């Protein structure tokens, strides 16, 4: 059996393998209204990670006995396309995809005003087109933008980024090698204007001091992403006004 050797993640010059500084994020691109048949849609790119999200609803729930009398039902599906990774993925839903669908649904339920739409259903679909770490957060943000594109009332947009530990150094917005070989990975998503956490998970080990520093790093990154999200919405509506 071939033993894979852990690569150095932080080089002698203090930079990461992809040339970024420890507190530097990958380039971000957001586009709304990319699917004409969905009520709302968005593509969210963070480096080489690329996710498309589509929203349908609120619409009448079928069968009706599954409807809730006081709120909308939120159905969420996170799926990685077979061509999203280096090795072709089995198209059947994996345990990880089912788990992440639940994690993302719970985060979205904290921001959508589901109580405004009793006896209805809102469907959210996310397809990972390219995966290079951070797919849960990019999918969550793509879904948040697609919901905004659909005009569904929310308490706030969701912005998120992961902070990890690579060769003992805290790094912002992990790439695939850092995700695979690093000592810790902490995805954080927030509703920034409300200063509320929508998602926080920690895999690996951090000291209490590192955890506090990681949270501060994440908050700075989230503020940058949040501004880009708002700008993407403004751009979309500026285009609609011109039409």
Curated annotation (Swiss-Prot):
One of the GO biological process terms: rRNA catabolic process
Principal subcellular localisation of the protein: cytoplasm
CDD domains in alphabetical order: RNase_PH_archRRP41
Keyword annotations from UniProtKB, A to Z: Cytoplasm, Exonuclease, Exosome, Hydrolase, Nuclease
The keyword Transcription regulation appears for this protein: no
GO MF, one annotated term: 3'-5'-RNA exonuclease activity
SUPFAM superfamilies: Ribonuclease PH domain 2-like, Ribosomal protein S5 domain 2-like
The keyword Hydrolase is annotated on this UniProt entry: yes
Self-association and partners: Component of the archaeal exosome complex. Forms a hexameric ring-like arrangement composed of 3 Rrp41-Rrp42 heterodimers. The hexameric ring associates with a trimer of Rrp4 and/or Csl4 subunits.
NCBIfam families, per database record: ECX1
Function: Catalytic component of the exosome, which is a complex involved in RNA degradation. Has 3'->5' exoribonuclease activity. Can also synthesize heteromeric RNA-tails.
Protein name: Exosome complex component Rrp41
Organism: Sulfurisphaera tokodaii (strain DSM 16993 / JCM 10545 / NBRC 100140 / 7)
């Amino acid at each position: 059996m071939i033993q894979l050797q852990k690569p150095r993640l932080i080089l002698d010059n203090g930079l990461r393998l992809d040339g970024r500084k420890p507190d530097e994020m990958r380039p971000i691109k957001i586009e709304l209204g990319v699917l004409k048949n969905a009520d709302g849609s968005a593509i969210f790119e963070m480096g080489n990670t690329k996710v498309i999200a589509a929203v349908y609803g609120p619409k009448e729930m079928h069968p009706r006995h599954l409807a809730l009398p006081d709120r909308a039902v939120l159905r969420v599906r996170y799926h990685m396309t077979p061509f999203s990774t280096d090795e072709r993925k089995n198209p059947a839903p994996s345990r990880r995809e089912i788990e992440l669908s639940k994690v993302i649904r719970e985060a979205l339920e904290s921001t959508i005003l589901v109580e405004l739409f009793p006896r209805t259903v809102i469907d959210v679909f996310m397809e990972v087109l390219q995966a290079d770490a951070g797919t849960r957060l990019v999918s969550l943000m793509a879904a948040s933008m697609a919901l905004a594109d659909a005009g569904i009332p929310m308490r706030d947009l969701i912005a998120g980024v992961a902070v990890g530990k690579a060769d003992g150094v805290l790094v912002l917005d992990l790439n695939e090698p850092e995700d695979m070989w690093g000592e810790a990975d902490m995805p954080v998503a927030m509703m920034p204007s409300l200063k509320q956490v929508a998602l926080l998970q920690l895999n690996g080990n951090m000291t209490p001091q590192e955890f506090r520093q990681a949270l501060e790093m994440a908050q700075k990154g989230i503020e940058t992403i949040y501004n880009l999200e708002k700008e993407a919405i403004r751009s979309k509506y500026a285009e609609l006004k011109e039409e």
